[in-house]
Swiss-Prot record:
Pfam families: TPR_11 (PF13414)
Protein's UniProt name: Tetratricopeptide repeat protein 36
Domain of life according to the entry: Eukaryota
UniProt xrefs under InterPro entries: TPR-like_helical_dom_sf, TPR_rpt, TTC36
Entry similarity comment: Belongs to the TTC36 family.
Source organism of the structure: Caenorhabditis elegans
Keyword annotations of the record: Repeat, TPR repeat
Name of encoding gene: ttc-36
Record keyword Repeat present: yes
BP-aspect Gene Ontology terms: tyrosine metabolic process
Stretches forming TPR repeats: 43-76, 78-110, 115-148
């Protein structure tokens, strides 16, 4: 007889692309960034304006807003993360990497910003063909609960995906009584 935890672990093995929260294994609850800095609230407002501009594909203006947000509060990791996204969209990966490294140095280890920055940085590494660095960052993001990072880790390991598929087929046949 198996326990619910045993079934959850087995489900993770058989369904590697399923987010852990759907499998019965406890989900990691990430912290939000919060700073004790007099300019933090204004920085957040400028950052929201920058995000709106970026969504409207006004990337130069968005970068200006993110830069202003960082001038007001230079320790705001999410502003670095968002500016990095705008740089990525402008095909400026070096600037994006600089901002992502700064975001990761400022963000707490279990924050949403850290998770997002790891995914962004890993994506840049993957595009460059540096799968080892990509794998490391995707693993960090996956540990923080990113289902996208988890999918990328499986994609970077075709043998794991093949083994999981074979195991799923064997267990399905065992369930239905097929040989």
């Amino acid at each position: 007889m198996s326990t619910s935890h045993d079934r959850a672990v087995l489900n993770q093995i058989l369904n590697p692309l399923m987010p852990t929260s759907d499998s019965g294994i406890a989900e990691i609850h990430l912290e939000s960034d919060s700073l004790e800095h007099p300019g933090y609230e204004l920085s957040l407002q400028l950052e929201r304006e920058g995000v709106a501009l970026a969504e409207g594909v006004r990337l130069d203006e968005a970068i200006e807003k993110f830069t202003k947000a960082l001038e007001v509060c230079p320790k705001n990791p999410s502003a670095y993360n968002n500016r990095a996204q705008a740089y990525r969209l402008q095909n400026k990966p070096e600037k994006a990497l600089d901002d992502l490294n700064e975001a990761l140095s400022l963000a707490g280890p279990k924050t949403k910003t850290a998770c997002q920055a790891y995914v962004q940085r890993a994506s840049i590494y993957r595009l460059r063909g540096d799968d080892d660095k990509a794998r490391t960052d995707f693993a960090s993001a996956a540990e923080l609960g990113s289902s996208f990072a988890k999918m990328q880790l499986v994609a970077l390991n075709p043998y794991a995906a093949m083994c999981n598929k074979m195991l799923a087929e064997v267990f399905e046949k065992a369930k239905t009584g097929e040989d």
